[in-house]
C-alpha cells in the first residue's frame, strides 16, 4: 500500500461520546506538548493508559484547535433580533483577531435571526474553542455550532 494517496476524513465529535482510551490518548499528548510529561511512558502513566492504546490512537486524535489551525471555520448562530447582538458577535471575533470572510444573515422571523459566519483563524490570538465559547456567552446568542471547516 506504500505510495497510495491516503486522504483522511475528519469529524467534529463531542468528547462526551468518545471512548475513554481516545480521551486519555488526547490527554497524554497534551501533557507531552505542554512539557508536563517528558516521555510517552510518563504521560501514559499519569493518565492511566496503556502504551499500546496510546500508539493505536496517537495519530488519529488531536484537539479541535490543532485540527483547525490556519483554516476557515464556518459556524451557524441563532441570535435574538435585538439591536447590538450581531455587533457584539463581530466585536468578539475582532478581539480574537479572526478574519471574517463571509457573513450571511436571514431575515429575522419571530424575533430570531439565523447567521452564518466564516472566519479565517490564521492570525487568531487564542484557540477556536475559546472563540466559540466567548460567542456563546454573548447576551442574545441562543445557539452556536460549527458547521464546517477546511
Curated annotation (Swiss-Prot):
What superkingdom does the record give?
Bacteria
Taking every annotated instance into account, which residue ranges of this chain make up the domain ACT? 74-149
Where are the bilayer-spanning segments?
none
Its taxonomic placement starts with: Bacteria, Bacillati, Bacillota, Clostridia, Eubacteriales
Protein name per the record: UPF0735 ACT domain-containing protein DSY2247
Which HAMAP family does the entry mention?
UPF0735
Family statement: Belongs to the UPF0735 family.
